Curated annotation (Swiss-Prot):
It is found in: Cell inner membrane. The keyword Protease does not apply. It comes from Koribacter versatilis (strain Ellin345). The lineage of its organism: Bacteria, Pseudomonadati, Acidobacteriota, Terriglobia, Terriglobales. GO terms for cellular component: plasma membrane. Keywords: 4Fe-4S, Cell inner membrane, Cell membrane, Iron, Iron-sulfur, Membrane, Metal-binding, NAD, Quinone, Repeat, Translocase, Ubiquinone. NDH-1 shuttles electrons from NADH, via FMN and iron-sulfur (Fe-S) centers, to quinones in the respiratory chain. The immediate electron acceptor for the enzyme in this species is believed to be ubiquinone. Couples the redox reaction to proton translocation (for every two electrons transferred, four hydrogen ions are translocated across the cytoplasmic membrane), and thus conserves the redox energy in a proton gradient. This is NADH-quinone oxidoreductase subunit I 1. It is a peripheral membrane protein. Residues 53-83, 94-123 form the 4Fe-4S ferredoxin-type domain. Its cofactor is [4Fe-4S] cluster. [4Fe-4S] cluster 1 binds at residues 63, 66, 69, 113. Binds 2 [4Fe-4S] clusters per subunit. The keyword Amino-acid biosynthesis does not apply.
Length: 152
């Protein structure tokens, strides 16, 4: 019997070699984890997040009540009601309800809007305690802003 295999078993040389390779990968040189919420990820312009409605220079909504966004939505999440203004004879949006709870953020409603009033913004923090909070009306959509920075 040879002494070399016996020494390998006694001093566990193969085990030590394997563990050295394992521990080399356990302590990476650069950390890939984002320290959220202290460090926010960089959001690109093409990101589709929280829906919002743009307002014009005069502070009124740009929506003309055409209902194209509701027709384009594959999940039927948008409910809109519009009436004709008796003075100007133009369609005016009366109610607008957007249910974000089932939205898949496909952007079809944004593409269908002829006035570009509906926009899927860069907000991604939409966690709530109830489903009722996910149903957004016109006032909430018009007054959406950029996400607030984290403070400890």
């Amino acid at each position: 019997m040879s002494i070399a295999p016996l020494l390998r078993k006694v001093f566990l040389i193969d085990l030590i070699k394997g563990l050295s390779i394992t521990f080399k990968y356990q302590a990476p040189k650069d950390c890939q984890t984002e320290q959220y919420p202290q460090e926010r990820p960089v959001i690109t312009d093409r990101f589709r997040g929280q829906p919002m409605m743009k307002l014009g220079e005069n502070g009124e909504t740009l929506c003309i009540g055409c209902n194209l966004c509701a027709l384009a939505c594959p999940e039927n999440l948008i409910a809109m009601k519009s009436d004709r203004d008796p003075v100007t004879k133009k369609k005016v949006m009366v109610t607008y309800v957007y249910d974000v709870s089932r939205c898949m953020f496909c952007g079809l409603c944004e593409e269908a809007c002829p006035t570009q009033s509906l926009k899927l913004g860069t907000g991604y923090e939409m966690a709530l305690y109830s489903r009722e909070g996910m149903v957004l009306d016109r006032k909430v959509l018009e007054h959406r802003t950029a996400p607030e920075p984290y403070e400890k």
